[in-house]
């Protein structure tokens, strides 16, 4: 269950060396493809784009304005197959929001058997005491019909027939009630201010603004028309992949190091992140209950190429559950997007929805990040559009968003599709989706904040700016003028005016990802034209 560096090849046997070699050969096409695409991008910009004064102050950035259904993109769009988990096993158990594990009598009847034909047991899942990449299991507990889970929020469940044959294996997660101390600290009005809003962040890996509009039209319509969210057309990534972008957003940190000789960027990544102040720490200090959840344990922000956290980073932390679910070997669906009978993304949505429901009368900060459906394939996330819409619809219908700032985002655009070889693809890969919805009562109390968002919706912005916005919310810095110049070293809160005459350098966007450039006409006798034709 541990995701750490392997020992050196000289210290292991020859068979493992061969296996490692096969793995390297297997991954090499992906590595070479990435290198190829980046070289194509660099060549395109050097040949066809005009440098727009990266660090100067005498120009206004012209934000590229592509139609999501541009002809260049259409040939890369397709209808993704719907998720078909099938019925690899009956739904023999479920976990209710009050923490009780139940036998599903309806499923038992449909299986053609009786309750007595099954012996079921649950095993609690715990975070490993020393590793963020492992989990621990409690002692299996046999239960009859229904039983209260003892101390964990996560369980694995197995059911056997009288013959001893395994008939069912699955897992469940729920949101326990906060401890009395946490309950009181996060209760709205416990410090005399009943109006502090909660913050809900729902992220999708590799999701550009344009592709969000293409693939998730129902969710986009709900966010923009029902939640009245502001969508930021000039939002630009600050790094190649998830980690540098989310470190800018969640910590206000620039993790890039530029080689003085080659000029190339590299990323500094610590082994552990406990000593790095993250935004949820600031919310926690100010009486918020915190939650963090990702659906792909091998590719999470803080564990891919690193070791995560020594201690649990937030009050509610679902990583042990996902590690345990990935360990299940039986009753797998033919559809890799499922755990048994259930689409994997539904576990994340259910956990987030239950958290929001139980924290309705409490201040909370929730960060849920979905990777599995959106990371690799340009089109696959479309299968979850109605599920995302329904989650937000239910939250709103139940009054759970009445005092909640909702942020929906992508970290960057898709990095693997051949769309990147086109003009529109090169641009949108740099321009992630970002939408912010302020609750109505909050807007009435602070109209200048909504005005600031609207004024900046087509400005050049980066993740450093939205880190500043999160810190404003965490610290109740909501006046027309900020009480601090900034919380990090880069960035300006989009709650307040940001100049349109802003450069990528001023926004913390590396030159490699700057979109403040224009295509230019070249004379037919230009050396660059002759080079390109060669």
In which residue ranges do the predicted regions lie?
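A long, amphipathic alpha-helix that forms part
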Residues: 12-22, 27, 149-152, 191-193, ...
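Short coil/turn segments at secondary-structure boundaries
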Residues: 35-37, 170-173, 213-217, 261-264, ...
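Histidine-centered active-site microenvironments of extracellular/periplasmic hydrolases
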Residues: 305-313, 397-449, 479-510
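N-terminal signal-anchor transmembrane helix specifying type II single-pass membrane topology
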Residues: 1-44
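Beta-strand-enriched, solvent-exposed domains that form extended recognition/catalytic surfaces
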Residues: 40-189
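Substrate-binding rim/cap in mid-to-C-terminal beta-strand-loop elements of soluble/periplasmic
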Residues: 239-257, 422-477
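Active-site-proximal alpha/beta segments of enzymes that process anionic O-linked groups
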Residues: 152-154, 179-379, 472
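Polar, surface-exposed loop/tail segments
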Residues: 301-303, 449-457, 461-468, 472-533
């Amino acid at each position: 269950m541990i995701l750490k560096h392997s020992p050196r090849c000289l210290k292991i046997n020859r068979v493992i060396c061969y296996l490692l070699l096969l793995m390297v050969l297997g991954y090499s096409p992906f590595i070479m493809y990435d290198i190829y695409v980046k070289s194509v991008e660099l060549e395109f910009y050097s040949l066809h784009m005009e440098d727009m004064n990266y660090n100067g102050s005498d120009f206004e950035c012209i934000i590229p304005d592509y139609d999501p259904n541009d002809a260049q993109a259409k040939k890369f769009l397709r209808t993704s197959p719907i998720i078909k988990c099938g019925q690899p096993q009956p739904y023999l158990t479920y976990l209710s929001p009050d923490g009780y594990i139940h036998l599903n009598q309806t499923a038992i009847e449909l299986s053609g058997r009786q309750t007595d034909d099954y012996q079921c047991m649950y095993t609690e899942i715990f975070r490993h005491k020393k590793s963020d990449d492992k989990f621990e299991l409690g002692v299996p507990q046999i239960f009859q019909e229904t039983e209260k889970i003892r101390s964990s929020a996560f369980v694995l469940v197995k059911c056997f027939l009288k013959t001893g044959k395994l008939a069912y294996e699955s897992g469940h997660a729920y949101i326990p009630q906060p401890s009395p101390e946490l309950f009181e600290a996060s209760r709205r009005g416990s410090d005399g201010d009943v109006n502090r809003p909660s913050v809900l962040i729902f992220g999708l890996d590799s999701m550009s603004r344009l592709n969000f509009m293409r693939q998730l039209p129902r969710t986009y319509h709900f966010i923009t028309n029902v939640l009245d969210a502001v969508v930021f057309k000039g939002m630009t990534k600050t790094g190649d992949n998830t980690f540098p972008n989310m470190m800018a957003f969640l910590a206000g940190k620039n993790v890039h190091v530029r080689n003085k000789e080659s000029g190339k960027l590299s990323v500094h990544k610590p082994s552990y992140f406990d000593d790095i102040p993250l935004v949820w720490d600031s919310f926690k200090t100010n009486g918020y209950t915190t939650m963090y959840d990702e659906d792909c344990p091998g590719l999470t922000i803080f564990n891919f190429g690193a070791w995560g956290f020594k201690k649990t980073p937030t009050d509610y932390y679902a990583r042990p559950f996902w590690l345990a679910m990935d360990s299940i070997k039986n009753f797998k669906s033919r559809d890799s997007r499922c755990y048994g009978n259930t689409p994997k993304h539904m576990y994340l949505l259910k956990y987030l929805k239950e958290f929001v429901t139980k924290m309705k009368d409490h201040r909370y900060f929730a960060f849920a990040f979905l990777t599995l459906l959106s990371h690799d394939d340009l089109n696959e996330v479309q299968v979850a559009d109605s599920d995302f819409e329904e989650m937000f619809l239910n939250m709103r219908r139940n009054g759970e968003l009445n005092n909640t700032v909702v942020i929906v985002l992508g970290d960057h655009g898709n990095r693997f599709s051949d769309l990147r070889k086109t003009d529109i693809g090169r641009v949108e890969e740099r321009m992630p989706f970002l939408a912010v919805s302020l609750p109505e009562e909050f807007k009435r109390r602070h109209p200048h904040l909504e005005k600031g968002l609207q004024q900046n919706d087509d400005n050049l912005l980066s993740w450093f700016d939205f880190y500043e916005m999160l810190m404003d919310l965490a610290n109740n810095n909501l006046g027309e003028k900020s009480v601090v110049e900034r919380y990090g070293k880069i960035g300006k809160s989009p709650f307040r005016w940001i100049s349109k005459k802003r450069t990528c350098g001023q926004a913390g966007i590396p030159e490699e990802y700057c979109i403040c450039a224009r295509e230019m006409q070249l004379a037919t006798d230009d050396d660059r034209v002759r080079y390109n034709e060669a």
